[in-house]
C-alpha cells in the first residue's frame, strides 16, 4: 500500500490471483517509505497466507542469510533481490550457498570487485561505443565502502570513456590493496 495502516496487498494479491496471475511479487515497503526504513516482511507473510499462487518476497535482502530469514519468516516461495545486487552480483552465489548449505561465502576481494567493474565497463563499451556515461551509476556501486570512496565517486561523475573508468578502478585497487 501507499502508507502503513492502509494495507491493500493481501486483497490486491487475491484480485490478481482471481484474474489469472500465476504468481505475485510483494515488496514489503510502503510507497511512502521510498528507500527509507525497513521492509515489512509481515505483509509478505499475510499475502502468502491469503493466496494459493506462489509469492515472491522482496525487500531488505542484502545477503544469503537475509534470503533464508525471509523464507523462514514469511513462507514465501521465492525471493527477489533489488538494489543489493548493484555492484554486488556475488550476492546470488552467497544466497545459493546459504540456501543449499547454510553457510555464507567470503566477501569478494578488492581485486575481484575491480576486475568485475572493469569487465562491466568493457561490455558496456562494446555495446555503446566510446562514450559509456551510463557506467557512472554502476561504478558508484562498485566503489561503495572502499577507502577514498568519496574521491573515487567524484572522479566517476566526470568519467566518459573506458580508459577513464579503467584508471578509476586501477586507482581504487591501489588505494585498497590488502596487505
Residue ranges and their predicted role:
Residues 1-5, 30-37:
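Short, small-residue-enriched loops and turns at beta-alpha junctions
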Amino acid at each position: 500500500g501507499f502508507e502503513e495502516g492502509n494495507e491493500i496487498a493481501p486483497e490486491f494479491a487475491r484480485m490478481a490471483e482471481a484474474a489469472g496471475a500465476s504468481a505475485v511479487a510483494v515488496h514489503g515497503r510502503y510507497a511512502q517509505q521510498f528507500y527509507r526504513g525497513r521492509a515489512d516482511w509481515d505483509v509478505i507473510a499475510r499475502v502468502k497466507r491469503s493466496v494459493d499462487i506462489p509469492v515472491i518476497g522482496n525487500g531488505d535482502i542484502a545477503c544469503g542469510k537475509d534470503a533464508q530469514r525471509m523464507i523462514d519468516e514469511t513462507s514465501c516461495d521465492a525471493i527477489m533481490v533489488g538494489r543489493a545486487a548493484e555492484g554486488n552480483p556475488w550476492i546470488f552465489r552467497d544466497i545459493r550457498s546459504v540456501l543449499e548449505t547454510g553457510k555464507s561465502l567470503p566477501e569478494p576481494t578488492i581485486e575481484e570487485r575491480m576486475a568485475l567493474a572493469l569487465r562491466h565497463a568493457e561490455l558496456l563499451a562494446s555495446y555503446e561505443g566510446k562514450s559509456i556515461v551510463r557506467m557512472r551509476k554502476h561504478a558508484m556501486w562498485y566503489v561503495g565502502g572502499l577507502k577514498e570512496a568519496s574521491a573515487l565517486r567524484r572522479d566517476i561523475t566526470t568519467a566518459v570513456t573506458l580508459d577513464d573508468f579503467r584508471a578509476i578502478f586501477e586507482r581504487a585497487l591501489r588505494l585498497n590493496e590488502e596487505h
